[in-house]
């Protein structure tokens, strides 16, 4: 049967004014396998029948060659066509004909016209059709006496003429860019397609010509390295490469043999939750010598490897780049010594190097984060939280020493996240002459305010401004001098241990996949790249430049140019240091603003509880108190304000230990101000609020919009108001990150690790894990990526029967390949709102039924456990960053009003004035108070902090029914997850 035109026409018309020729042509095409789907006669018509009919037609017959799609065997040996949506490779109706396993069909319109027609026999009409049975079609044409015209075009087999004289050509190529198809089984039975001997030979040749990549983990180990090994291995296999593990770092390259081993898909299963690196790491002295690199070159060429993905610190990456520079000389030397053949020399004369930065210190320039850094930070805050309990019990001081010989990132971030009193980091060394006195003042002041514990963080590379080391013992002695019972805790290599946190699993995975792409896209002219993350985007930076800039930091410190050293760190480092000072040191009264500029700032929690509400409230309070502002907590949400006027002023001692406290200390619920807007306005006026920070999820976003919309009726709402998104669902428009979502992901990763362990122990059990998120698939997509789920179901990607069938096929295949081995636990991630039909229980039941004893299924619903207990390090650090930004926003907006000499006292209070009868904002000077951009949602877009007017978000970027933003910024996570689980391979094959 002829199939769709490779000329990309949706239909073609053949016209005649001869009734007999019209019938003859109709019979010709029906003999070729076309079917009549519509007929029209002018004398018998209705308005409906005129749709698509030419005005000059007396008769029309529409002939169609139906799309070829998969068939299945039914009872009695009959074959039934599968629904197109369930066929192999189906994408959508819009893409029909572009999928390799479906064709779009074609329509021929035969028209009998009432006009005189002149046929140009020298330039006849011509169209080309695809057929998967070219020989059968040719035989059929000969049988009916049609003319066979040899073709002069490569893609066209032959042509013929229909009774109207139009040239009809036939091809075995579905499109101009596709491969030749000579069997209908390609469409009807995709799994039964018969492979020719030529295709088998081609495959063998392609096996020999596959790119071979080696993955190395070198230098100090870091949590997340195993995730990188898994990602590089599976992405390499997916893209048609062979991937080798180089064991024990560069030692494996030098020694070769069994220390260079090819990795298969199943070799890297279950690695996401394992800390360290299973392929080992070591510092190799031999590789530092030229003879060692020569031997490494020989071992690589002998195995056909000419690409290296190196995961390590700046030393490991420097060695890799040197190896690439020397490679042409090394391989030429091997050829001269007859250790390799001329063919090997020509094939592998260029080496490709791609770097992944694995370092807990986060000391590499050109990237916002390195693999392992946040896991190490997570370990530090977990241990310091434990220390806090005993320190408070005994009213002790603890000096905690953390890693960071040349970089103070761990020291700075752990200081913020643990509520430390003081930190020592190399980029901001204290004065040699007075650091001891300064330390005493800060710690004594905090004690006088009622604090029972003292925490001082010391980076192992801490120095004073004269480059003298500051040791933990020295710090202890200073604290003992002021009468504090002091202990020293050196965390040491505990910081490297344990399972990687959610962010490091994500980072190592997406960077590992991009590393393989970088290898395949590399040319000898492209400098060796290092895969980095900047502004929340995966980018490639020149390896040499990144390493050189990193070494510049150490040089700047040695030259006592500490400002330059600080600038060379990532863009948030200096800001974070200032944030730490604002909540720990600036409470000494040195940063008080004039009384006329002091504000009353209200904070309210709205929506479901998350683990980061308290840390954000703590920072906003401490930062504001340090400047002389008053901070009021609205207790129990808007319901508490409306019913009881529940407002409480917060003091320093009230919030100082909220840095590691989950839930909400001031209470939260889903009530909205619209429940009684007048009462809300009354209490705002009573307490003379100058600004409002609403911390919460979609309800907080809605509350801000309602307050903004009520400004025309209640002038008190003209105060600057800011919504700080805090929800596990991460569904607030205007931001790519919400406080609490990282804690939730860490909780989910631990939960799923435990579930997978149970599944692995049972050998033949699969768990379907239901996660929260509402109609936002962010949580499910992210969790699926970091837990290695076989399949992820989200509201953004509707589930159908074909999807479930593919996933069960993948599950069955995976069980067959695992053969009951360890680390073979399998999970599916299902968003709670992914489908009304394909629920978590139904998916589990379908899996269990499909298993037929080979495997079984269970459901696992973590429920509100996902909210987490203690906030994660990322949530604590970002709570500090965003809360201070909110305070600054409120201060700036008030400054413009309170210091405007042209406004009267009443106009300053109302925050608007009338200009020639037009109501005008005192903040923006615009003619509409509602549009003065002082009701905003703070968000993180990439790495940039943004303030977006709530009205703009509500009207343009919000799905109100689904309670989320329109921007699905996490879609790429699903693609990477499907690639590494094998799901994408099922769909492409």
Curated annotation (Swiss-Prot):
Beta-D-fructose 6-phosphate 1 binds at residues 359-361, 403-405, 460, 493-496. Belongs to the phosphofructokinase type A (PFKA) family. ATP-dependent PFK group I subfamily. Eukaryotic two domain clade 'E' sub-subfamily. NCBIfam families: 6PF1K_euk. It catalyses: beta-D-fructose 6-phosphate + ATP = beta-D-fructose 1,6-bisphosphate + ADP + H(+). It is an enzyme of class 2 (transferase). Allosterically activated by ADP, AMP, or fructose 2,6-bisphosphate, and allosterically inhibited by ATP or citrate. Disulfide bonds: none annotated. Its EC number is 2.7.1.11. Its main location: cytoplasm. GO terms for molecular function: 6-phosphofructokinase activity; AMP binding; ATP binding; fructose-6-phosphate binding; identical protein binding; metal ion binding; monosaccharide binding. The active site is at residue 361. Beta-D-fructose 6-phosphate 2 binds at residues 396, 487. ATP binds at residues 220, 283-284, 313-316. Mg(2+) binds at residue 314. InterPro entries: 6-Pfructokinase_euk, ATP_PFK, Pfk_N, Phosphofructokinase_CS, Phosphofructokinase_dom, PKF_sf. Catalyzes the phosphorylation of D-fructose 6-phosphate to fructose 1,6-bisphosphate by ATP, the first committing step of glycolysis. Pfam families: PFK, Pfk_N. PANTHER family: ATP-DEPENDENT 6-PHOSPHOFRUCTOKINASE SUBUNIT ALPHA, PHOSPHOFRUCTOKINASE. This is ATP-dependent 6-phosphofructokinase subunit alpha. The gene is PFK1. Beta-D-fructose 2,6-bisphosphate 2 binds at residues 765, 858. GO terms for biological process: canonical glycolysis; fructose 1,6-bisphosphate metabolic process; fructose 6-phosphate metabolic process. Heterododecamer of 4 alpha, 4 beta and 4 gamma chains. Beta-D-fructose 2,6-bisphosphate 1 binds at residues 670, 727-731, 772-774, 832, 864-867, 963. It is found in: Cytoplasm. Residues 586-599 are annotated as: Interdomain linker.
């Amino acid at each position: 049967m002829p199939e769709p035109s490779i000329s990309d026409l949706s239909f073609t018309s053949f016209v005649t004014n001869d009734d007999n020729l019209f019938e003859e042509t109709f019979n010709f095409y029906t003999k070729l396998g076309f079917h009549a789907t519509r007929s029209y006669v002018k004398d018998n018509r209705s308005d409906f029948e005129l749709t698509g009919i030419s005005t000059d037609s007396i008769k029309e017959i529409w002939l169609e060659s139906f799309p070829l799609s998969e068939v299945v065997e039914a009872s009695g040996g009959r074959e039934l066509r599968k629904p197109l949506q369930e066929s192999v490779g189906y994408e959508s109706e819009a893409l029909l004909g572009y999928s390799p396993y479906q064709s779009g069909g074609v329509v021929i319109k035969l028209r009998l016209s009432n006009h005189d027609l002149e046929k140009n026999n020298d330039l006849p009409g011509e169209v080309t059709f695809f057929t998967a049975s070219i020989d059968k079609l040719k035989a059929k044409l000969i049988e009916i006496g049609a003319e066979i015209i040899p073709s002069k075009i490569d893609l066209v087999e032959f042509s013929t003429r229909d009774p109207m004289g139009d040239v009809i050509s036939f091809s075995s190529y579905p499109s101009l860019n596709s491969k030749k198809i000579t069997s209908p089984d390609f469409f009807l039975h995709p799994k039964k397609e018969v492979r020719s001997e030529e295709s088998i030979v081609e495959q063998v040749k392609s096996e020999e010509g596959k790119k071979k990549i080696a993955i190395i983990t070198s230098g100090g180990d870091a949590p997340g390295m195993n995730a990188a090994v898994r990602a590089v291995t599976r992405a390499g296999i997916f893209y048609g490469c062979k991937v080798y593990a180089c064991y024990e770092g560069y030692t494996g390259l030098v020694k070769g043999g069994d220390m260079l081993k090819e990795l298969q898909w199943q070799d890297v299963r279950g690695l996401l939750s394992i800390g360290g690196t299973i392929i080992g790491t070591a510092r190799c002295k031999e590789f530092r010598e030229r003879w060692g690199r020569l031997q490494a070159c020989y071992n690589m060429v002998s195995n056909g490897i000419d690409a290296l993905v190196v995961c390590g610190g700046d030393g490991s990456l420097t060695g890799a780049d040197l190896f690439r520079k020397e490679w042409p000389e090394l391989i030429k030397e091997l050829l001269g010594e007859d250790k390799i053949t001329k063919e090997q020399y020509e094939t592998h004369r260029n080496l490709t190097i791609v770097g992944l930065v694995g370092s807990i210190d986060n000391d590499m320039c050109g990237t916002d984060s390195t693999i392992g850094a946040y896991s190490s930070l997570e370990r530090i805050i977990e241990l310091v939280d434990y220390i806090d309990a005993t320190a408070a019990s005994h009213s002790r001081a603890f000096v905690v020493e953390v890693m960071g010989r040349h970089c103070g990132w761990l020291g700075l971030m752990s200081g913020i996240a643990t509520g430390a009193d003081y930190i020592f980091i190399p980029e901001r060394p204290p004065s040699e002459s007075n650091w001891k006195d300064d330390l005493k003042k800060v710690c004594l002041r905090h004690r006088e305010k009622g604090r029972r514990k003292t925490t001082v963080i010391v980076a192992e590379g801490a120095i004073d401004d004269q480059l003298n080391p500051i040791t933990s013992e020295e710090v202890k002695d200073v604290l003992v001098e002021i009468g504090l019972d002091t202990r020293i805790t050196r965390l040491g290599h505990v910081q490297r241990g344990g399972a990687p946190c959610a962010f490091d699993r994500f980072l190592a995975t997406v960077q590992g996949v991009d590393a393989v792409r970088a290898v395949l896209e590399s040319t000898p002219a492209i400098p060796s790249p290092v895969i980095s993350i900047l502004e929340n985007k995966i980018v490639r930076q020149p390896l040499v430049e990144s390493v050189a800039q990193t070494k510049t930091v150490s040089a700047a410190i040695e030259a006592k140019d500490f400002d330059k050293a600080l600038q060379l760190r990532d863009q948030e480092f200096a800001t974070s240091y200032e944030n730490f000072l604002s909540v720990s040191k600036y409470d000494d009264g040195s940063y008080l603003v004039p009384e006329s500029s002091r504000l009353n700032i209200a904070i309210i929690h709205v929506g479901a509880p998350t683990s980061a509400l308290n840390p954000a409230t703590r920072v906003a309070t401490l930062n504001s108190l340090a400047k002389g502002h008053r901070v009021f907590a609205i207790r129990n949400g808007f319901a508490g304000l409306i019913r009881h006027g529940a407002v409480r002023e917060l003091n320093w001692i009230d919030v100082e230990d909220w840095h590691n406290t989950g839930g909400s200390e001031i209470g939260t619920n889903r009530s909205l101000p619209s429940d009684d807007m007048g009462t809300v306005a009354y209490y705002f006026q009573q307490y003379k609020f100058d600004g409002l920070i609403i911390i919460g999820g979609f309800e907080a976003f809605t509350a801000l919009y309602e307050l903004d919309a009520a400004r025309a009726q209640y002038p008190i709402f003209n105060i600057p108001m800011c919504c700080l998104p805090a929800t596990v669902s991460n569904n607030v428009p205007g931001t790519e990150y919400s406080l609490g979502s990282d804690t939730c992901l860490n909780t989910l990763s631990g939960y799923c690790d435990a579930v997978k362990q149970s599944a692995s122990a049972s050998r033949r059990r699969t768990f379907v894990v239901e996660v929260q998120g509402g109609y936002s698939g962010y949580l499910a997509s992210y969790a699926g990526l970091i837990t290695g789920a076989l399949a992820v179901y989200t509201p953004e990607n509707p589930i159908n029967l074909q999807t479930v069938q593919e996933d069960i096929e993948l599950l069955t295949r995976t069980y067959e390949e695992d053969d009951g081995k360890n680390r073979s636990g399998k999970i599916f991630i299902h968003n709670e709102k992914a489908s009304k039909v394909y629920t978590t229980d139904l998916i589990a039941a379908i899996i269990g039924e499909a298993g037929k004893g080979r495997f079984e299924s269970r459901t696992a619903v973590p429920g509100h456990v996902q909210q987490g207990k203690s906030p994660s390090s990322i949530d604590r650090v970002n709570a500090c960053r965003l809360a201070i930004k909110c305070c600054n926003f409120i201060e700036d907006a008030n400054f413009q009003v309170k210091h405007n000499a042209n406004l009267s006292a009443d106009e300053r209070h109302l925050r608007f004035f009338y200009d020639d009868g037009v109501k005008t904002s005192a903040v923006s000077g615009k003619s509409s108070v509602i549009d003065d951009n002082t009701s905003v949602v703070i968000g993180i877009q990439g790495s940039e902090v943004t303030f977006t007017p709530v009205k703009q978000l509500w009207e343009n970027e919000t799905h109100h029914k689904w309670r989320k933003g329109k921007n699905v910024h996490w879609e790429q996570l699903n693609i990477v997850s499907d690639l590494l689980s094998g799901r994408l391979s099922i769909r492409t094959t």
